[in-house]
């Protein structure tokens, strides 16, 4: 069938090409719409004749009428032109649409039908030839290029091969190359004809020996295998967080008759279903029956909550409304706003009450960004109501740190500090933030920032900054910031600046001239600069007199002639720094660097007696200028803070002074693993010598992680420096402070004796001799003759050296000097307690002769008569009198401590020592249960008074003292239980329970944690330990629970590995690893995610060491660079990385140099030393 039926017979009648050319009206631009009427009439006639069965007549068209119609406008077109333009446009659109549809249908018929009749095909070819002739007549210039024209039009319609005259023009040569053929080495897959194979066989191959694998998609339908989701996927984690549906039982009224058995109801006893015409089988429930009847549920049923989730949502909505009401009524309550912010976590964890539909709950619950935005919106509302609240602004900055850029966050910090320059907590947070930004960090920048902070706060404290008043606790906070700066410089390797800061602060605090005391701090610092640059000996140096003496000398005029001491020998220099040049280069660098850190921690100054100048210094970094320390000098007016300054200085020098940094910078300063050492405590649990370093190293110490921390002292020059500090500072103190400082000096020497006992026994004799000489010299001073603390340490020293009889003589002499003070003297109780404990630990048998000596000591303590040496067993009467005296003294102390709100200091001082002596006395005379009863009685009495949870600001001092007393008593309790377990058979459960209760109250006590980890390591039940650690870490703000939880898991892993090895070789265990490695890694990640753990160098060192021990080098590198993002100032991290990754030595040194950390041995100097 032709495309246009009106010209079907025309194509058959006319064979001439001229008619076909002129009748090609599809391409004739002169065709008009008026021809449509005549064409449609001819089509109707042809259709009518075809339906009657007669052959269609042949029409003969005359060319001239068609030409005239085509050359001029027809009457029909003129009539149509006079109609409205709107109808004309509509007809054109309709005609084009019909033409498009017919053309599309024609192409489909041509492409799909291959069995059309020859007659129809001839008609189609004739009509196409007529149209082609008409195009040739209209374009005579083209002539013989008809085939080219047809080929050009091939992009618009189909072309029959018979219509083309010259077959050579069918194909066209494209001379433009296709770069894709060269690039992909094959044709584009869209240009390759596709076909479908039927079957996978191939002719000509042997099916038994050969096979062809056809590429392409298989005809079989692929079934997607859905893997089961595990518990840690997002969907399942969300399900785990949802609240479980409460299951409520239906309790039946209890019968009075005794029940002999509990009957089990049978399902057959259930009520038989009721049948009806609607429910003939009785299988429909009530809801289905109502639906079949066209009814709905009852009104009361529809109003009831359909699930537990609805009730929870209703309760949660009520809490939200309550919070909104309360903050609307009390917009100035900042704590209420903070509680509202914390409440958003609970709202987002709940099954989203604000969800828009199903599935939205999980998205809302898991969307961290949505949670942060909600919290931020609440905080912004709170700040609008309280524009002066620093706490709310700090909370906002901490929240914005999750999704703000560091640069934007730093600008907000600076704006906040500009508005509140007198807020010390704000300064502390800002310094910690800047200290942990690796991109912008450098030692000099942060050092100047510390100086700016301290100088600004000094101006506020002096009143120079009139716009902002002084806040309470400013001086204590300034001292804490000063210590934080010193620890920062020590960890960065700049030990010389740390020592110079303490030297300047001691002179600025204790040797200040009277003429400048009333001046502002800034002016005092200006007067101090000439003294610092004068070359006068400073604190710790020989001949130091202080700032005041130098000022008097300047006012009198003249000069002081310094003569060299001829008795002193020259300082012994190291023979050579590199002892073995065959070692790898990184090992040599680490050894030399650590050696220089140990020897060169004091600032270098030119020796005028040797005519030295500043140019003689080989390392300019060892010289400290006044510009490096001037801004950090602060004024301390409190005597307690002045004494803490000396204690902190001695602690930096390695002296066990008992000083701990403030809580704000404690974990920033923690960088060594001495908190896990428990060897001495295991040997002697009662008389354990605790140096109380708390994981903080001293100056000049850059040791490897895991090496035991011994107080072995410094070299000769360093020891002389420490002695000079004591000699200069001791005359400045008096009373209890001087006694405590003398005790610290003696404990420092005893610690070196203990080091010699365990490592170098060759030096034990000389070290013991010098230590006894110091003790005797201190006791010879008039104010120390009755100092029982010094007598106690001297006797303990003799006992450690093995001189038991001499130690007993010292103890007896000290106790005979006490007189009749009885149980009211704390120092006397401590002396007697140590004496009795040493006697108990001397004999392995608790019922031996030494036990009688211990009972004698504790009994004579209660008597009013002077003390007498041990002569024999104590009588039962004396024991009963002593017990009665202890009871009365304990009741008296407890009554005084609990009666008044601020407990008296005298009662608190003697209470702890008295309870410990009484517990030991009861243990020796009755047993361990009696001692435990004393502990329980005291603990129950003082627990409510101590307010362990949250002491108020007005009674924080008294509560802290009571807490310290309880902590000391708890430690005595655990030590006594451990000692009893060593000498007798005793269950482990009481000790475990005691430690658990104590650690919940004192989560920062490292001694208790060490004992807990050790006893739990002997147990095979790890679940209780893990649950306990999880409970403490969730509630406590300290970092010690995390550290000891990791240590406990590492000990367990070490135990499992030791069992799986025989003779040093690994045994293929049949049991799995139990996931200890993943558990330890998860503990590390959770600890680092906390606020205090993120900036703790010790935690990062432990994490890096653990991953290296597993052999995963790439992951260890990632953790190292992650640690640098949080602690870029810690030099020990870089040195650990050099030991773990020797190939990265140059890169790590470049980073250290870029961040301005102290590098004492550049690689260039190392090469020169190796060449020599």
Curated annotation (Swiss-Prot):
Ranges for region Disordered: 46-144, 292-313
Domain of life assignment: Eukaryota
Coiled coil: 78-330
Pfam families with a match to the protein in the record: NRDE-2
SMART domains attached to this UniProt entry: HAT
GO biological process, one term: positive regulation of RNA export from nucleus
Subcellular location: Nucleus speckle; Nucleus, Nucleolus; Nucleus, Nucleoplasm; Nucleus
HAT repeat positions: 314-346, 404-436, 766-800, 986-1018, 1075-1109
Keyword Coiled coil belongs to the record: yes
Modification type N-acetylalanine: residues: 2
GO cellular component: a single term: nucleoplasm
Comp. bias (Basic and acidic residues): 120-139, 300-313
Family: Belongs to the NRDE2 family.
PANTHER family recorded: NUCLEAR EXOSOME REGULATOR NRDE2, TETRATRICOPEPTIDE-LIKE HELICAL
Domain notes: The MID/MTR4-interacting domain is necessary and sufficient to mediate interaction with MTREX.
Function noted in UniProt: Protein of the nuclear speckles that regulates RNA degradation and export from the nucleus through its interaction with MTREX an essential factor directing various RNAs to exosomal degradation. Changes the conformation of MTREX, precluding its association with the nuclear exosome and interaction with proteins required for its function in RNA exosomal degradation. Negatively regulates, for instance, the degradation of mRNAs and lncRNAs by inhibiting their MTREX-mediated recruitment to nuclear exosome.
Binding partners and assembly: Interacts with MTREX; the interaction is direct and stabilizes NRDE2. Interacts with EXOSC10, EFTUD2 and EIF4A3.
The name this protein goes by in its record: Nuclear exosome regulator NRDE2
Organism: Mus musculus
């Amino acid at each position: 069938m032709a495309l246009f039926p009106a010209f079907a017979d025309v194509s058959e009648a006319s064979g001439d090409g001229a008619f076909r050319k002129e009748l090609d009206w599809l391409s004739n631009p002169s065709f008009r719409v008026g021809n449509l009427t005549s064409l449609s009439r001819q089509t109707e006639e042809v259709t009518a004749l075809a339906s009657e069965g007669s052959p269609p007549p042949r029409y003969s068209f005359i060319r001239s009428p068609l030409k005239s119609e085509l050359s001029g406008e027809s009457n029909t077109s003129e009539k149509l032109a006079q109609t409205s333009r709107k109808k004309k446009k509509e007809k054109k659109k309709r005609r084009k649409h019909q033409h498009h549809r017919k053309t599309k249908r024609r192409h489909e018929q041509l492409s799909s039908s291959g069995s059309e009749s020859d007659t129809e095909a001839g008609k189609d070819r004739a009509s196409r030839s007529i149209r082609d002739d008409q195009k040739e007549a209209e374009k005579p210039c083209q002539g013989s290029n008809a085939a080219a024209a047809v080929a050009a039009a091939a992009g618009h319609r189909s072309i029959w091969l018979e219509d083309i005259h010259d077959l050579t023009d069918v194909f066209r040569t494209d001379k433009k190359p296709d770069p894709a053929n060269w690039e992909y080495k094959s044709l584009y897959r869209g240009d390759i004809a596709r076909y479908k194979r039927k079957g996978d066989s191939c002719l000509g191959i042997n099916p038994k020996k050969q096979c062809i694998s056809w590429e392409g998609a298989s005809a079989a339908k692929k079934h997607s295998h859905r893997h089961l989701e595990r518990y840690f996927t997002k969907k399942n984690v969300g399900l785990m967080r949802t609240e479980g549906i409460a299951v409520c039982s239906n309790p039946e009224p209890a019968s009075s008759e005794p029940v002999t058995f509990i009957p089990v109801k049978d399902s057959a006893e259930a009520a038989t279903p009721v049948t009806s015409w609607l429910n003939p089988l009785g299988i429909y429930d009530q809801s289905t029956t109502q639906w079949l009847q066209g009814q709905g549920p009852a009104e009361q049923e529809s109003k009831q909550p359909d699930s537990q989730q609805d009730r929870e949502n209703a309760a949660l909505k009520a809490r939200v409304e309550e919070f909104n009401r309360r903050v609307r009524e009390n917009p100035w309550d900042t704590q209420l706003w903070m509680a509202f912010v914390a409440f958003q976590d609970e709202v987002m964890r709940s099954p989203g009450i604000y969800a828009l539909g199903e599935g939205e709950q999980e998205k809302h619950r898991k969307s961290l960004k949505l949670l942060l935005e909600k919290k931020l919106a609440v905080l912004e509302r709170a700040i609008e109501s309280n524009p002066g609240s620093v706490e709310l602004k700090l909370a906002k900055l901490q929240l914005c740190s999750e999704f703000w850029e560091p640069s934007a966050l730093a600008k907000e910090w600076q704006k906040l500090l500009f508005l509140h320059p007198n807020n010390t907590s704000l300064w502390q947070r800002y310094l910690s933030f800047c200290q942990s930004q690796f991109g912008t960090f450098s030692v000099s920048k942060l050092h100047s920032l510390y100086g700016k902070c301290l100088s600004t706060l000094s101006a506020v404290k002096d009143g120079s900054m009139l716009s902002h008043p002084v806040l309470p606790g400013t001086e204590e906070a300034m001292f804490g910031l000063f210590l934080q700066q010193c620890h920062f410089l020590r960890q960065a390797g700049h030990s010389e600046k740390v020592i110079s800061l303490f030297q300047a602060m001691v002179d600025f605090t204790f040797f200040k001239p009277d003429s400048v005391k009333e001046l502002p701090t800034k002016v005092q610092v200006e007067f101090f600069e000439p003294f610092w640059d004068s070359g006068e000996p400073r604190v710790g140096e020989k001949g130091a007199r202080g700032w005041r003496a130098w000022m008097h000398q300047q006012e009198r005029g003249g000069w002081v002639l310094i003569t060299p001491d001829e008795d002193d020998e020259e300082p012994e220099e190291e023979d050579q720094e590199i002892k073995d040049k065959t070692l790898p280069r990184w090992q040599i660098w680490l050894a030399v660097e650590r050696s220089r850190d140990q020897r060169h921690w004091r600032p270098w100054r030119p020796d005028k007696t040797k005519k030295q100048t500043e140019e003689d210094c080989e390392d300019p970094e060892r010289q400290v200028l006044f510009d490096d320390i001037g801004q950090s000098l602060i004024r301390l007016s409190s005597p307690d803070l002045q004494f803490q300054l000396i204690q902190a200085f001695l602690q930096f020098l390695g002296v066990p002074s008992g000083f701990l940094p403030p809580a704000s910078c404690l974990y920033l300063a923690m960088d060594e693993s001495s908190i896990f050492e428990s060897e001495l405590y295991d040997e002697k649990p009662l008389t354990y010598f605790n140096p109380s370093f708390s994981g903080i190293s001293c100056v000049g110490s850059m040791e490897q992680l895991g090496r035991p921390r011994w107080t072995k002292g410094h070299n000769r020059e360093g020891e002389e420096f420490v002695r000079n500090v004591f000699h200069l500072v001791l005359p400045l103190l008096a009373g209890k402070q001087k006694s405590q400082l003398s005790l610290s000096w003696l404990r420092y020497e005893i610690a070196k004796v203990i080091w010699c006992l365990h490592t170098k026994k060759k030096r034990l004799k000389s070290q013991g001799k010098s230590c006894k000489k110091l003790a005797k010299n201190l006791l010879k001073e008039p104010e120390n003759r009755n100092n029982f603390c010094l007598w106690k340490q001297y006797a303990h020293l003799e006992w450690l050296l093995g001189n038991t009889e001499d130690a007993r003589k010292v103890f007896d002499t000290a106790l005979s000097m006490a007189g009749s003070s009885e149980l009211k003297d704390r120092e006397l109780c401590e002396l007697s307690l140590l004496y009795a404990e040493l006697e108990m630990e001397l004999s392995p048998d608790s019922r031996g002769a030494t036990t009688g000596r211990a009972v004698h000591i504790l009994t004579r303590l209660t008597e009013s008569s002077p003390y007498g040496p041990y002569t024999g067993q104590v009588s039962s009467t004396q024991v009963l009198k002593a017990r009665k005296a202890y009871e009365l003294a304990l009741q008296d102390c407890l009554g005084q401590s609990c009666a008044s709100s601020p407990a008296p200091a005298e009662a608190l001082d003697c209470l702890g020592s008295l309870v410990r002596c009484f517990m030991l006395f009861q243990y020796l005379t009755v047993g361990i249960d009696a001692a435990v009863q004393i502990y329980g009685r005291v603990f129950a009495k003082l627990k409510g008074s101590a307010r362990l949870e949250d002491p108020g600001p007005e009674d924080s001092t008294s509560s802290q003292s009571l807490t310290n007393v309880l902590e000391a008593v708890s430690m005595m309790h655990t030590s006594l239980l451990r000692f009893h377990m060593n000498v007798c058979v005793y269950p482990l459960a009481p000790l475990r329970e005691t430690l658990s209760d104590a650690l919940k109250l004192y989560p920062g006590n490292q001694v208790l944690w060490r004992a807990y980890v050790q006893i739990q390591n002997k147990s095979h039940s790890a679940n209780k330990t893990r649950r306990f650690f999880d409970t403490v870490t969730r509630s406590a703000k300290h970092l010690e629970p995390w550290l000891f939880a990791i240590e406990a898991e590492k000990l367990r892993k070490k135990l499992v590995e030791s069992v799986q090895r025989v003779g040093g070789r690994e045994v293929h265990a049949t049991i799995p690893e139990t996931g200890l490695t993943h558990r330890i890694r998860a503990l590390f990640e959770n600890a680092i995610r906390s606020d205090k753990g993120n900036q703790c160098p010790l935690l990062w060192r432990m994490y890096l060491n653990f991953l290296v021990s597993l052999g995963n080098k790439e992951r260890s590198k990632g953790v190292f660079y992650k640690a640098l993002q949080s602690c870029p100032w810690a030099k020990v991290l870089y040195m650990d990385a050099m030991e773990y990754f020797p190939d990265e030595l140059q890169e790590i040194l470049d980073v250290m140099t870029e961040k301005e950390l102290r590098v004492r041995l550049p690689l260039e100097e190392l090469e020169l030393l190796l060449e020599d």
